[in-house]
């Protein structure tokens, strides 16, 4: 085949990446006039959100203490199955026939499978009037017990009718107070601007008079908190910019992830949200190019987190035996100056043994130089010394 398949694969991959990778960056999608120093604003917001994640336990405890019976009912769930079970009980008790879901494209509804669940319960969607309404709480504030919702005039009208209002929030969405909410709203507004210009922030304080119910969902977020370097990824805004510029995601798509998280943020979180042994490949698929860090609105150090994932996977021995054996042999070669300085013929043989047949089937092993860089450097030094 003389590398024709390989050349075709490379050219198609390059075309795919060029066509799919967005040229947008965070800097050219915002109004720079809103910020005196955009880079500093991103870092500050990142620090605030990551600090809230670090203090999640304190903020949740404070929120629980601040909540009064007059605010309505509040439920805690470790997984979405328990949440849906409680929701089914509520539907049966109240004899609910119609529902309304605000912002149906939200990743949260996809995560808990709300739409498919309501269809199974034989309830019908109603825009004009519904027995129960669902809203995503983008942030919950521990000092006041209020929520932040992105909505429009229709959302406000829905909140004030006589239906049962169900608010759903992940534990990672808790914030200490509203001191830095202005900066968060500016950057979040810019992120949602292209999707829907009519959305604007609403801070809502729940009340039992309005039949308000709050569902707080863990769903393995607390498991991520056990990993100190990776826990700050829970501050993610879910803007999708990192996926837009990721060469792996643009070439392979999101089918490999099979989750609401995809792209670089999935390479960090998925191994800890799911069974880590089944998702080791997502951390190793990353090329560590750094495009995601450049466009992240809150400057998350995604490359460092992915590297920490790989280190943890290696320490726990979660790689298949064949991969571990190859890594061990490669490590021996790369850490030995003598082996690296061997003539190219023997290096080529070793590479053939280390690389599987599937990789060598349609791809040529690059030709090795006769001398290593170290040998050439010493040789050049000797020549210069002799000339003197």
Predicted regions and their residues:
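The feature marks the mature, well-folded catalytic cores of soluble enzymes
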Residues: 1-229
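Intrinsic disorder at enzyme termini
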Residues: 1-36, 308, 323-388
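Secondary-structure junction/capping motif
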Residues: 55-58, 78, 113, 177, ...
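Short, contiguous, pocket-lining structural segments
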Residues: 173, 234-238
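Ferredoxin-type iron-sulfur electron-transfer modules in oxidoreductases and energy-metabolism complexes
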Residues: 209-233, 249-360, 364
């Amino acid at each position: 085949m003389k590398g024709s398949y390989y050349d075709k694969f490379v050219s198609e991959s390059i075309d795919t990446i060029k066509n799919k990778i967005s040229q947008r960056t965070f800097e050219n999608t915002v109004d720079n006039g809103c910020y005196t120093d955009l880079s500093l604003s991103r870092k500050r917001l990142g620090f605030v959100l990551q600090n809230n994640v670090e203090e999640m336990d304190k903020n949740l405890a404070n929120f629980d203490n601040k909540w009064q019976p007059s605010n309505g009912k509040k439920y805690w769930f470790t997984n979405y199955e328990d949440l849906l079970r409680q929701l089914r009980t509520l539907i049966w008790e109240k004899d609910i026939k119609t529902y309304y879901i605000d912002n149906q494209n939200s990743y949260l509804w996809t995560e808990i499978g709300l739409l498919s669940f309501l269809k199974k319960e034989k309830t019908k969607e109603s825009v004009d009037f519904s027995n129960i309404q669902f809203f995503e709480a983008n942030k919950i504030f521990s000092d006041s017990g209020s929520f932040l919702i992105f909505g429009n005039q229709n959302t406000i009208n829905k909140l004030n009718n006589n239906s049962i209002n169900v608010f759903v929030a992940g534990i990672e969405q808790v914030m200490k107070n509203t001191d830095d909410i202005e900066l968060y709203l500016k950057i979040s507004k810019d992120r949602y601007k292209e999707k829907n210009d009519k959305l604007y922030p609403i801070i809502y304080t729940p009340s039992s008079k309005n039949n308000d119910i709050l569902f707080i969902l863990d769903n393995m977020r607390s498991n991520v908190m056990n990993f100190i370097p990776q826990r700050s990824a829970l501050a993610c805004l879910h803007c999708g910019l990192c996926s837009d510029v990721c060469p792996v995601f643009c070439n392979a798509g999101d089918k490999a992830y099979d989750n609401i998280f995809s792209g670089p943020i999935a390479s960090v979180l998925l191994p800890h949200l799911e069974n880590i042994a089944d998702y080791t490949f997502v951390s190793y698929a990353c090329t560590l190019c750094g495009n995601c860090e450049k466009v992240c609105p809150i400057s998350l150090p995604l490359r460092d987190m992915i590297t920490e994932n790989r280190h943890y996977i290696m320490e726990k021995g979660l790689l298949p035996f064949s991969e571990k054996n190859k890594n061990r042999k490669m490590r021996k070669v790369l850490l030995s100056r003598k082996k690296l300085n061997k003539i190219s013929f023997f290096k080529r043989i070793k590479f053939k043994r280390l690389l599987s047949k599937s990789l060598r089937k349609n791809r040529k092993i690059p030709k090795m130089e006769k001398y290593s860089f170290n040998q050439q450097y010493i040789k050049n030094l000797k020549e210069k010394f002799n000339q003197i």
